[in-house]
């Protein structure tokens, strides 16, 4: 996209944009009433059918044996399902006599219980989906895999987590009638105050961004991907087989990609040589970027192939709960060259004060570490536009959000694009059998980071972005 190369005239106006080179045209005006419901209603996309469920054999994500279904959040066999349930119900603490990296296969899975349980946790088995009495019929059947930190996995493997839970319940008795699983499920829902039906969205400048930002609720440590029905990982003993892409899957993916605005961002990020960017100017630029990215998400909704299948109220509710995640996902993928290129050049011209460095929060440090990790993960995967479009739709179609009127319809849509994404990755990346689960496990990390950013004070965002962009750009430049 061409930019006006004329030097900025006059002083820095109210937007704090002195020194930045303006584009030839301003961004389109924001909608006046939430998501422009009149414009949304005028669209009439064609109705599409749901592809038939595939009956091909699935393999257990833990050992590669024949899977029998979705157990505690992931596709697994009866053996690993029972082992995980017994280990959690009986609070087992195992030991590995080797290096804690034993091979897991159908024949070798019983040789090391420690490594088997470790892999169950790493692949996303949800221990909170097991009933406390150990009887069949676990809690939270709609919840998919969970992603927990290495520290929490270590607490579970060492037994420390079991001891802490026992102490908690002994101290609280029956004062809390909800189970841990129920509390986790409830806390995963956005607060009623975060829905756009109770507060109209304005996209102009800092005030709206701040109100939206501060109004979001923080997700719990466990972040769920709803309805992980079908991702499969091939055992090393079961090499992937050649397959063809279903024509209907290709058509639906093409429609998803067509709904995306893949043009470069229009927010000016060029800056005069030698110009020293202030904290206020960098913050104003970040707000303008957020405004443009959010506007693109609204335009994206109106172009979705399934637009006519949901109500405007549900779209409003979905976007109010996922907009931060959508912006983060797009910044790490389709707009990463600009964000980690042009924006990184701007942040390099910002020098934080000693006071800013001293007051930087622990929450900010955690966000920095996770963002850098996630950037390298996406950089390694080299996510295609097709995969990005599917990941975005899957993350957006979260039927566990409070206030929805068509949760069952959302479940079917989520399932549809889950299968489509798996079809595409297994077809295009035949020799990367773990690519699809690798992509899907990035989604709970995105949700976690987006939720954690709520705890970072707004005045610390310029420093946070400077550190992340500098670290990522420097490390990639060395490759």
UniProtKB/Swiss-Prot annotation:
Q: Which residues bind Zn(2+) 2?
A: 96, 102, 112, 115
Region annotation Disordered: where it falls in the sequence: 1-32, 131-150, 162-198
Query: Which keywords does the record carry?
Result: Developmental protein, Differentiation, DNA-binding, Metal-binding, Nucleus, Receptor, Spermatogenesis, Transcription, Transcription regulation, Zinc, Zinc-finger
The residue ranges of the NR LBD domain are 248-479
Task: Give a Pfam family name.
Answer: zf-C4
The biological process GO terms on file are: cell differentiation; regulation of transcription by RNA polymerase II; spermatogenesis
Q: Could you say which protein family the record assigns here?
A: Belongs to the nuclear hormone receptor family. NR6 subfamily.
Name the record gives this protein: Nuclear receptor subfamily 6 group A member 1
